[in-house]
Amino acid sequence: MKLHHIALAAIAAATFASQAQAAVFNGATSAAGNVATEFTIGSALSFDLDLVSKAPITLNFTLESADFSGDAMTFSALVRNLSGLGFDNVNVTLSGITFAAPAGTITTDGFSAVSAYGSSATQAWASFTPGVSSEFYIGSPLGNAGEVNWTLNLDGLQAGQQFSVTVAVPEPETYGLAVAGLAALGFAARRRKAG
């Protein structure tokens, strides 16, 4: 009987020891009381982000040698809107690392629809109709059918390097100002070309 317990303890220890931590989470930076809670298991970086404002939140990481063991590193987040304001869109921006193919998903809890979405090597974005007032999902933090985590590309990176993931829900006015600025630049360039 004693040997049986020792064998079970050894198997449990080996199981937990083989699950290397994905990357060291160095904390989050944000303004206005936004909170990040880490739920990382193995090589799957997973977070709950509780946003009380539209201020961006940046998650900071350091790679370890165990991160290059062959398991793909993935990212997911459940983003809760605690602000009472509708989130019209989301931008996820990477610094120091890139997304690997295939792209992951950005979905909602069903009270709003994803009206447009896209991604590049360092950014993923989505627009919501109507604005999300409850929560949305970057990747598959709850393991729901049809949702896919975002895979991070470790090619060319080394242990000790740092990277960050910034989640922002910008104000619609930000886009309006950007469009107005681009229109003004286009007008100035056209005028210069004509003159």
Q: What is the predicted role of each segment?
A:
Residues A23-A168:
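Mature extracellular "passenger" or substrate-interacting domains of secreted, surface-exposed proteins
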Residues M1-A14, S18-F25, Q158-A189, G195:
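Short, threonine-centered small-residue motifs that mark membrane-proximal processing/anchoring sites
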